[in-house]
């Protein structure tokens, strides 16, 4: 196979790129994958003409050549193993502890996971799925991920939300600019979405005070130390609202012109 060279989405250096599995291979990503990207789902001409969406068949699992060897090795050693434990625990709960057809969510109670490592793996995957030019703009996120001991994360500029998927889906949107109406004013909201069965994530840039419907804000874990175990008791919603299969305008409708919980 020909070597692939380009800009590493994490360190920013021009180097030979290695294949970054998104999600990690042992997190339900070992077999051939059918990947749906944001570029395809927002092909308005195709949608108007009623044409079928085109999937990318990936023989070695979902992912792409986005990280240099050093960054791939480091993040794999530092973060991926903990994310795999987390994703597999969620998968076990969904398939063995609830009725997936009737349950609306799960309750997670654990003190055995290093959530800072999980968060940094999530951010590394976002960087790998974001368009190369955009990835370089997130220098603060890249520096946070590159330093395993860093606890400095700008939670005013970014919010990371999580939800659970009922059906199998591997898809990612890249950075989307959505036109939303807020109190009569039209604003552009930038988000990135990853559906990595059994978990989905949304990264918001310059988030509003309102959380996204049916998601759990996990940004607070960014301030944990690398070796810090955290007792986590949280509820995660099972939803298909942010599936890229049916995304279109639902996100816009449900997250525009909403009141905060206090009615303001």
Range-by-range predicted roles:
Residues 32, 38, 71, 75, ...:
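Generic structural signal of hydrophobic/aromatic residues within well-ordered alpha-helices
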Residues 131-264:
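C-terminal, charged low-complexity interaction regions
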Residues 33-36, 47-48, 92-96, 100, ...:
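Short alpha-helical interface elements
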Residues 43-49, 53-54, 97-100, 176-183:
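Low-complexity, polar-biased intrinsically disordered regions enriched in Pro/Ser/Thr/Gly
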Residues 43-44, 92-95, 227-229:
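Glycine-rich loops and low-complexity Gly/Arg-rich segments
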Residues 2, 52-133:
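Catalytic cores of phosphodiester-bond-cleaving enzymes
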Residues 1-77:
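An N-terminal structural lobe/cap that precedes and organizes the functional/catalytic core
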Residues 17, 63, 117, 186-189, ...:
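Short, well-structured alpha-helical interface segments that form or flank functional binding sites
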């Amino acid at each position: 196979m020909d070597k692939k060279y380009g800009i590493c989405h994490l360190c920013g250096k021009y180097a030979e790129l290695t294949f970054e599995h998104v999600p990690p291979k042992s997190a339900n990503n070992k077999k051939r994958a059918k990947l749906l990207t944001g570029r395809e789902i927002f092909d308005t001409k195709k949608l108007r003409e009623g044409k079928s969406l085109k999937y990318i068949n990936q023989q070695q699992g979902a992912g792409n050549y986005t990280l240099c060897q050093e960054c791939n090795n480091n993040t794999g050693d530092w973060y991926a193993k903990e994310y795999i434990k987390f994703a597999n625990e969620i998968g076990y709960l969904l398939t063995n502890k609830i009725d997936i057809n009737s349950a609306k969510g799960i309750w997670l109670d654990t003190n055995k996971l290093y959530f800072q490592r999980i968060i940094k793996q999530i951010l590394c995957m976002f960087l790998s799925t974001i368009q190369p030019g955009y990835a370089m703009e997130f220098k603060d996120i890249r520096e946070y991920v590159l330093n395993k001991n860093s606890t400095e994360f700008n939670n005013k500029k970014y919010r990371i939300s999580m939800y659970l998927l009922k059906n199998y889906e591997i898809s990612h949107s890249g950075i989307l600019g959505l036109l939303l109406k807020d109190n009569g004013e039209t604003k552009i909201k930038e988000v990135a979405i990853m559906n990595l069965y059994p978990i989905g994530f949304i990264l918001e840039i310059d988030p509003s005070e309102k959380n996204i419907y049916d998601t759990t804000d996990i940004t607070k874990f960014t301030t944990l130390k690398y070796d810090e175990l955290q007792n986590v008791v949280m509820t995660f919603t099972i939803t298909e609202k942010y599936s890229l299969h049916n995304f279109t305008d639902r996100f816009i409708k449900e997250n525009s012109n909403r009141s905060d919980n206090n009615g303001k």
